[in-house]
Amino acid sequence: MASSSTLLNDDWKQGLAAPPKDLRPQTEDVTATQGSRFEDFGLRRELLMGIYTAGFERPSPIQEQAIPMALTGRDILARAKNGTGKTASFIIPTLNRINTSLSHIQALILVPTRELALQTSQVCKTLGAHIPNLQVMITTGGTTLRDDILRLQQPVHILVGTPGRILDLGSKGIASLNKCGVFVMDEADKLLSEDFMPVIEQTLALCPQERQVMLFSATFPWTVKEFKDQHMVQPYEINLMDELTLKGVTQYYAYVEESQKVHCLNTLFSKLQINQSIIFCNSTNRVELLAKKVTELGYSCFYSHAKMQQAHRNRVFHDFRNGMTRNLVCSDLLTRGIDIQAVNVVINFDFPRTAESYLHRIGRSGRFGHLGLAISLLTLEDRHNLYRIESELGTEIAPIPAVIDPVLYVAPAMVEEERESPPPKPAAIAAPPAQQQPQQRQRQHPPVPSHQAAQQSPAAAPVQQQQQQQQQQQQQQQQQQPQYQQAYGQGPPQPQALFQQQPNSSPAPAPLPSYSQQAPTQAQGPAPVQSPPPAPSTQPQAPAQTPIQGQIPPTQPRAQQQGQQQPGQPGQAQGQSQPNRRPNTGGFRGNGRGQGHRGRGRGRGGQPGQPGAGAGAGQSQQAQA
């Protein structure tokens, strides 16, 4: 192995295809280090190449403390905040220890969820991309054992999976763990709960006595101490939790009636500068229902929960990670370990029941020291949980203000562009496309020289007068427009000033407001130049292929859906299909006899009427073919 000085003198970094440098500011959660570099740890050259190719620049505090001790083979018990680099803290020393000339399993990494297993295995492959003949295998529940059996017949160096499947493979002799020298548990607090503890102990018994055990998590309950006393040998303890919540995540709450949560969610989408967002619900049924509502508002949206097929869950996670959509509705399935740095907004549509769940939810934003925003929609029944979670986490969740400053959750460069650009006019008073075209052409053409501008000045005066007249007319129309309460009574309750305006929507007293045909555009980056009304969805979406459960393509608003909805595919919004009817040409009368129901019979295709389908008076009517 080359020494640190040799690595520093060589120009091996110049040929690496590193990604563009991330210029976003970072908080002290990842910058408060002692100035160490990855070269100072004595890592192998191939591993260093993978680290810098992946975009790593300097180790974070947890990496700076955990990697050197893990390289010595000592047991590690590390506690650090979400999104501060815990995954690389155990993968880097594990990869440095792997001997690819041996064909047996040398490291076992256990995680609580399938999505986290998929992400962890991908990180292993990315960081070890330059290590020759490195073999990483992932195995989780929801897949057939046959594929795992065939894969384990080949050399496997690192095995990543969920506890149940790992124990199944090990107890049946399919996966040999008797030479596995590294035993890692990510999200150890979850793995050492009552549900997983028996499985973990049985799996650990399959490993040799001379092993290295490493535990990483953001929270450590009392069960972790019991496991440490029984199965770990003088572990090196790391605790970087001066506070539980991330410093870069701003937390707000808003009291909202249950029937108006979707209405408030639409307002947040219209006002916030969302790069990507994750919306959490407390049950799988509410996940699918909310995903359908978000789609009806005109926003592209995927959903994921534990009852979906594993292939569909993997596809949704992969597409959301690659930016195929901006919004993901999910349950607590994705609260642990999921690292998507493009997510800057987390919305608790249902307030979590425990402080642990709340901590992991808001940790999906503000990853690796970046800025993030967490907003919780509360009902009156949730106020007790709010006080309890604040006291347990030692944090303060503030009421949502009238205006949320983008500086709190958006990169400064994007905020400056937003402020330099003129704000867009509301959709209700926006100028027609014909009036916007001259302004667009004026922005597209280069500046006119001064001598030509003098010649064009007489013609420019009428244009300016015309624009002033248009602005005055728009202001008059806005003043004459009926107010919300005058037209619809008291309307839905608006607990905070943020929800007073209804951008790009037509208010209605129903629990779910009916929205205009022009779907609201989710704010992103600098304000766009005025243009004709956009399509119902401006967000990226997956290509039209075989429907995947959990992926809901954007639909038209309700005003455009009458008579056009088709029966939904699995995982898509189930629309009420309308039968194709031709004019009545004197078909046969229905017999009015339903199976167990009495209703009006309807003939189909000119044939004798079928049994009545509705609960009616039992009298047949003129059939419609």
Swiss-Prot record:
Organism placement in taxonomy: Eukaryota, Fungi, Dikarya, Basidiomycota, Agaricomycotina
Residues at which ATP binds: A80, K81, N82, G83, T84, G85, K86, T87
Biased composition (Gly residues): 604-617
Compartments, record wording: Cytoplasm, P-body
Gene that this polypeptide is encoded by: DHH1
Catalytic EC class: hydrolase
Motif (Q motif): 36-64
Protein name: ATP-dependent RNA helicase DHH1
Keyword Transit peptide listed: no
